[in-house]
């Protein structure tokens, strides 16, 4: 009897323990959803990191290729410069040797002249030859000097561009190849003609703008390098009053219009007025139809030293 009572108590205790061990179904479902959200967030974060790493790797790879290309160009330019200098130096030595030889002949024939007047014409001919050789040598030396100076500028430009590329091109510190530096700006002079809008677009694609003339000194510099060729500048009134393409204040700035210009003339027969400015053959400004194919000048500002 006592054992049966104890078994009954044990059975009741086990049922209570089992009921106490059951977790509420709703709490278990919330746990599953929380873990699912956490897993999805982890997967999304992993995918985002993978994309960022791929983009950075692609940019680094492109930068390394650009650096290698520029380094190869620099090496080739340096090698070609050395070869040209050696060839020019050899040519100069040869010319100098020829001149020295001719001078010796002149001296020899000068002594013969003392013994016979019939040699005077030959001496005069030799002196003329020496003079021509010397003139040729001076011309060659001048060409050598100009070439060396240009090669030095090209080498400086390549070195500067390499440094700029290493700094991710954050600022323009030097002019690109075939651009001309003057007073903190780089200038590129076209050799063909385009309508004003196309010329403006071309300069924008080169990270520059159609030239903005800010002073008489800049006007004279541009005119010196353009000569008498009609050339577009970055000044237009297509959308209202006259304005410079870089936002420079036209009303307070420098101008150099020809007499009675701008006149917005309609008698050209091309439709509309004249909304774009250009240099005339004497350097003064004129407004004209924007679709005429004139040459143009691009301008790029250099970064100031910090």
UniProtKB/Swiss-Prot annotation:
SUPFAM superfamilies: C-type lectin-like
Keywords, ordered alphabetically: Calcium, Disulfide bond, Glycoprotein, Lectin, Membrane, Signal-anchor, Transmembrane, Transmembrane helix
Xref: InterPro entries: C-type_lectin-like, C-type_lectin-like/link_sf, C-type_lectin/snaclec_domain, C-type_lectin_CS, CD209-like_CTLD, CTDL_fold
C-type lectin domain location: 174-300
Domain of life: Eukaryota
GO CC annotation, single: external side of plasma membrane
CDD domains reported in the protein's UniProt record: CLECT_DC-SIGN_like (cd03590)
Extracellular side: 59-306
Sugar-bearing residue positions: 76, 168
GO biological process: connective tissue replacement involved in inflammatory response wound healing; immune response
Disulfide pattern: 175-186, 203-298, 276-290
Keyword Ribonucleoprotein among record annotations: no
Cellular location(s): Membrane
One Pfam entry name: Lectin_N
Membrane-topology descriptor: Single-pass type II membrane protein
GO molecular function: D-mannose binding; fucose binding; pattern recognition receptor activity
Cytoplasmic side: 1-37
TM region(s), chain numbering: 38-58
Entries under PANTHER family matching the protein: MANNOSE, PHOSPHOLIPASE, LECTIN RECEPTOR RELATED (PTHR22803)
Self-association state and partner proteins as the record states: Homooligomer.
Reported function: Recognizes terminal galactose and N-acetylgalactosamine units.
UniProt protein name: C-type lectin domain family 10 member A
Organism: Rattus norvegicus (Rat)
Upper taxonomic lineage: Eukaryota, Metazoa, Chordata, Craniata, Vertebrata
């Amino acid at each position: 009897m006592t054992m049966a009572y104890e078994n009954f108590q044990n059975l009741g205790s086990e049922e209570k323990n089992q009921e106490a061990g059951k977790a509420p179904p709703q709490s278990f479902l919330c746990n599953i959803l929380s873990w699912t959200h956490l897993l999805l967030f982890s997967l999304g974060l992993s995918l985002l990191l993978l994309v960022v790493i791929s983009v950075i790797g692609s940019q680094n790879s492109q930068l390394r290729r650009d650096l290698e290309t520029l380094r190869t160009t620099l090496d080739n330019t340096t090698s070609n410069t050395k070869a040209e200098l050696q060839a020019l130096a050899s040519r100069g030595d040869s010319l100098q040797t020829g001149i020295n030889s001719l001078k010796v002949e002149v001296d020899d024939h000068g002594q013969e002249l003392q013994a016979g007047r019939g040699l005077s014409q030959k001496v005069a001919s030799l002196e003329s030859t020496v003079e021509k050789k010397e003139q040729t040598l001076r011309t060659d030396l001048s060409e050598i000097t100009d070439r060396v100076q240009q090669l030095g500028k090209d080498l400086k430009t390549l070195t500067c561009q390499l440094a700029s590329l290493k700094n991710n091109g954050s600022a323009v510190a030097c002019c690109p190849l075939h651009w001309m530096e003057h007073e903190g700006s780089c200038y590129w002079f076209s050799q063909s003609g385009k309508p004003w809008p196309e010329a403006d677009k071309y300069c924008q694609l080169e990270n520059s703008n159609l030239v903005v003339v800010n002073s008489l000194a800049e006007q004279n510099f541009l005119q010196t390098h353009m000569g008498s060729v009609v050339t577009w500048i970055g000044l237009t009134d297509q959308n209202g009053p006259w304005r410079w393409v870089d936002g420079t204040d036209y009303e307070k700035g420098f101008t150099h219009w020809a007499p009675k210009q701008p006149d917005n003339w309609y008698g050209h027969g091309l439709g509309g007025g004249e909304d774009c400015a250009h240099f005339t053959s004497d350097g003064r400004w004129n407004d004209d139809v924007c679709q005429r194919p004139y040459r143009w000048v691009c301008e790029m500002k250099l970064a100031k030293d910090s």
